[in-house]
């Protein structure tokens, strides 16, 4: 609010402008972290499969991520989020230079919120399935498959981390954009 | 940006001010819808149980929502979101009167985003479990329990609707707040 009596780029003091630029650079860093998180999750999950070695050549037990539809959704959602985040990087760089942009920030908030919902949905649906794989469920007669497929289970559990990290970073990104809008 | 040369409540034209007030009233309406959605979901899921009538008095098959930990999380998350949304209603009313508020809007965005993550997580984890209950999974040897517990399954499927609706409304709420911040 202070010094908002003028139009244009020069309406804020140098300190305030520096803080605004700092927020924009933080935005860029967070976006890169989120790209890494979602991409790592998608790749780690997408390359997961385990074949049981001790069965005959006729009956082979093999578990792939695509046997569980929820894990397929996890891979697709994380890939989409990662692609969007890479596309949004140039816009984030533009914001560092033009820190008073309004409409482009609103567009970024819109898509960031949508991607937050997508990544959160993927991460938590994945977590629900991974939990079942580890613990099973007595009343529904679903057995824990992790006793047979231990490396498969470790892998799908690990790939959740990147997705949950991306979720937290996306929340911070939305808040950063909101603060930047409020400071204009 | 237009007419931003003055401080205080009177800096915008009457039309622009009317639009701002309209956005705030929309915010209030959306919040009420989200309260109804999350509350209905929590209650519908929280009261779900089914006892199979055709078993003996010694062995009774009963399925309750709390047998599946994910569904318990669903109830808790929707209750928390619904409680937060009710608490946020007065602040939303204050925004109708004082449409240039900045910090209270930022606080609302912060909690709205957190609640969006919570509701999305609950809805999608619930959906993953409901999908399994309906379809089972061949490779993991998880059987579809909906063949035995049909009314249980209908109930838990139905209670997802309110949660997903609340998710969409929360996304719109965050966007409304962002637009309101940008229009200040």
From Swiss-Prot, chains A, B:
GO biological process: cell wall organization
Signal peptide boundaries: none
Domain of life assignment: Eukaryota
Glycosylation-annotated residues: 49, 137
Residues on Cytoplasmic side: 1-22, 94-105, 181-184
Location(s) in or outside the cell: Cell membrane
Pfam families the UniProt entry points to: CASP_dom
GO cellular component terms listed in the entry, alphabetical order: plasma membrane
Entry membrane topology: Multi-pass membrane protein
Transmembrane residue ranges: 23-43, 73-93, 106-126, 160-180
Ranges in the topological domain labelled Extracellular: 44-72, 127-159
Keyword field contains Transmembrane helix: yes
UniProt keyword annotations, A-Z: Cell membrane, Cell wall biogenesis/degradation, Glycoprotein, Membrane, Transmembrane, Transmembrane helix
NCBIfam families registered for this protein in UniProt: A_tha_TIGR01569
Function: Regulates membrane-cell wall junctions and localized cell wall deposition. Required for establishment of the Casparian strip membrane domain (CSD) and the subsequent formation of Casparian strips, a cell wall modification of the root endodermis that determines an apoplastic barrier between the intraorganismal apoplasm and the extraorganismal apoplasm and prevents lateral diffusion.
PANTHER family (alphabetical): CASP-LIKE PROTEIN (PTHR36488:SF12), CASP-LIKE PROTEIN 1U1 (PTHR36488)
The family this protein is said to belong to: Belongs to the Casparian strip membrane proteins (CASP) family.
Complex formation: Homodimer and heterodimers.
Protein name in UniProt: Casparian strip membrane protein 3
Organism of provenance: Brachypodium distachyon
